[in-house]
């Protein structure tokens, strides 16, 4: 045994001072002194358990002692009666055996291959023992999980990575995948659980037993992220679910990882063989598969970027020429040719490397250089980790640990060790470049593009350095990284084919580049990722955004400006087609062309296919809404024009819905026979409120009433003859149904018909005569106020003229001023008590004092008060033009009318923009104070003082 170097002899004196009396210096062998000087982990362990050192001296570690691990552990667990005891014994056993392995490794008592075997077998022994103990405990608690035939179902554990390959390093975490064979339920327990519940609960307990730190440490850090769907997927999957996933969604890196997968414990059982046979076709293709080279090149590029980004210098695993590159070289041959060459299907690296050389896939010299380098690097890695039982592959920067490694690796000093290390890593790098290679050097533009690709594909953490996000605040930067990570997790839950992933990987760097250039990057990205989640399984939409950069830019700008638009696009991705043509996107249909465009649009759909007709109506409306909102955001439509467009669109919809309902009713019952001698349908739709007043907003409902002029004795002329007035009732019911039916594209409009005579208690459709009689003899003042903002939005000229005459007659009735003032004011006060002041320290733009409703009540009051003197006041139904009429007819001073108009349009504009932001219609208390004061003054003048 090589004597300790000078720095280590000096350090030994520090060790002596720590040793308790039972471990006096004079009682220790030279071997013990060497190991205790090299490894703080061994030092701490034997100080806590001096008997372990005695055991090491009397029974030194042997190369084949791994064969006894299971028996030794079984004995240690024989008296365990609860989970806490299980956790303690597993931790103590792991530490005791790791001390023995560290002893053998430090003194080079066994080969490096033997060390890897011992480390891997120890992990497997501990995992299997914990699983078997917990399985029995869980069966006692919940019953035994069985399949449909009553056969007990086991939990199978796939050891992945180095654990699966039998090449575990000293301080490694363990990558596991849990599976069970068949669905079924537990039998014999206090209550029945299905197998998924049983194994999920058991899996959670198994992870806790192995992973949870206690005063005795932990057994292994458990990583379950290699399972299907990653962290977002089920903890345990049935064989069928595993097979479905790998057949439909398995990705290149998962295929790469599965090469080393090994079933822990009884690997020759029926279920183990079934699982292996199921996974083999996914891992090893029947044909020679050269696409693997680019996939592995991409993975290596990702690792290289991580090394640069996280500043991982002197990393013997991930650095150029490190352990990972040797693994990549070997697995290239396994994945390309393993399906045709069963001898390449080994999980362990060194036997596979020998096979590669025997098949002349690599030269003997290259294969030998890789073998020697691998053993050198793995010994260095394990020694490095055994100093403190620490998971690291980065060479130390302090003199003590450098001296320790140089001595243990049998070099005179640190420079000699690093010189040999450089030689080995250079050899590895040469073979790697010849076989896999790196992409050619990048231009500055390509480098920037690569950084965006890195941001998307490499799942950066918050502490990563991300130069492309340097311009963002720390909070925004963290939020962007979190959004990307959450989006990737969400993708794992979706069934996305290879083409979809390819398109997404092309799209996302461009999208992130554009979004993250914005100051509001985090907000915009949150809206767009919500949209993308809805379309990732529909490759056509991804391709649209990927192939048309202009469409992507429009999407980003619209989503940034309006969450309402983002929500609409997310709900109805068909609207993405609208982004292709900016000429139509930001240029809404002419106000008088909506009916014609809708008619043309509906010609594509069979007239007798009600479902497609309903869907087409909704799709047309959403596309037009998007255009109006886009123009609104772009500033090309003032508030009055926005409402005009929304109103014309609604009227076109009403026209089409009445047409559909009419065709359906006539097909069923025939036409009312009073129409035989005249044109038209004898039917009208009257719009009230915002529709009647040309003031619709983006989410406004429609206040409608239905009128007809059908005589009492009219009948329909179809085979199924019914009363004419019954026909119009069913027509109105059908119209309501067509508006409110929810399809995949939602409903068309919410319709409120409660403003009809007698409200909800009245008939849904009313004759023109009955309507006139009601308005003259029964209607309340508030119903006459509502009539101010009413107009026919669909109907025969004859019926329209009748309604207009009734409206004019009612509005021009002479009214006693004080009585009217009191009734209007009291109605407003009731509304305010019911709707206003609901939001403390906020101003409700519509309902609170000084808001929109006050202006509407002022105009309605003045029309009802003065129309008998000035009949021209009845001409318009919208507030802005009514205010113009009041000024023109000398009821209101022109200045006051202008002030109220400006306040009204300003407040309406704010409501539109709040709707685009999906925000409620209230603002901070100190907003619009000037407008509100002017409205209050006008209210006081007309409805209080006069």
Swiss-Prot record:
The protein's required cofactors: Mg(2+)
Region (Adenylyl removase), start-end ranges: 1-440
> Which Gene3D superfamilies does the entry mention?
1.20.120.1510, Beta Polymerase, domain 2 (3.30.460.10), Glutamine synthase adenylyltransferase GlnE (1.10.4050.10), Nucleotidyltransferases domain 2 (1.20.120.330)
Q: Write out the ranges of the annotated region (Adenylyl transferase).
A: 449-946
Q: Which family does it belong to?
A: Belongs to the GlnE family.
Checking NCBIfam families in the record gives: PRK11072.1 (NF008292)
Question: EC number(s) in its UniProt entry?
Answer: 2.7.7.89, 2.7.7.42
Output the Gene Ontology cellular-component terms: cytosol
> One biological process GO term for this chain?
regulation of glutamine family amino acid metabolic process
Point out the gene that encodes the protein: glnE
What this protein is called in its record is: Bifunctional glutamine synthetase adenylyltransferase/adenylyl-removing enzyme
